């Protein structure tokens, strides 16, 4: 389960502003490691996962088709797309952004989720963890409660959950609360330190 780095828009609006407008660096990126190609990691996900495992990949509309195609080419079976309803809107040039895609794959044989009555629209408020100055630790942080829904549906107690792009550790916190073992990987040392502190 992961929220990999992908191309983001500056989300400019009709007034010329944008969520990430002031955070884009000289390379035109919002984050230091913004443009990791999914063809580099999708085959590795498939290699390390057990047969029957579920795989959740979060993305936006810009990268949806590419990620879907690459994961299928890597051997995954696409089950369906889920929607994360953030319960808040971000002003854009056209329609306001309120949701993100969660692509739901499996490796090998089909295994049902644990709670078959779960809706494919997951309404979880988009809250950010902030530092002492009120600044977001991570601008694309995913809520722990959202991760708990996915983990609870696709694993049992003491199973191992992998998040290769763990950011500031929401998946790890969810695993801790649900009695799952967790393997988290993060290349950005600032985020890695924050994740360790949050999971301590």
PLM-predicted stretches and their roles:
Residues 1, 6, 10-24, 70-200:
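Class I S-adenosyl-L-methionine
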Residues 30-87:
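Conserved Class I SAM-dependent methyltransferase catalytic core
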């Amino acid at each position: 389960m992961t929220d990999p780095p992908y191309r983001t828009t500056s989300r400019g609006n009709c007034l010329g502003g944008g969520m990430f407008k002031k955070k884009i660096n000289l390379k035109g990126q919002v984050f230091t490691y913004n443009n990791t190609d999914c063809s580099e990691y999708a085959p590795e996900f498939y290699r390390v996962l057990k047969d029957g495992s579920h795989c959740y990949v979060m993305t936006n509309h810009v990268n949806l088709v590419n990620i879907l195609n690459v994961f299928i080419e890597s051997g995954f079976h696409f089950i369906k797309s889920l929607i994360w309803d953030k319960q808040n809107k971000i002003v854009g040039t056209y329609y306001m952004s309120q949701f993100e895609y969660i692509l739901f794959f499996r490796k090998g044989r089909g295994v049902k989720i644990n709670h078959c009555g779960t809706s494919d629209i997951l309404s979880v408020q988009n809250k950010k963890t902030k530092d002492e100055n009120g600044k977001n630790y991570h601008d694309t942080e995913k809520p722990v409660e959202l991760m708990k829904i996915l983990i609870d549906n696709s694993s049992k107690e003491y199973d191992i959950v992998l998040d290769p792009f763990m950011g500031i550790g929401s998946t790890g916190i969810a695993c801790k609360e649900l009695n799952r073992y967790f393997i988290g990987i993060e290349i950005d040392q600032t985020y890695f330190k924050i994740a360790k502190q949050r999971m301590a």
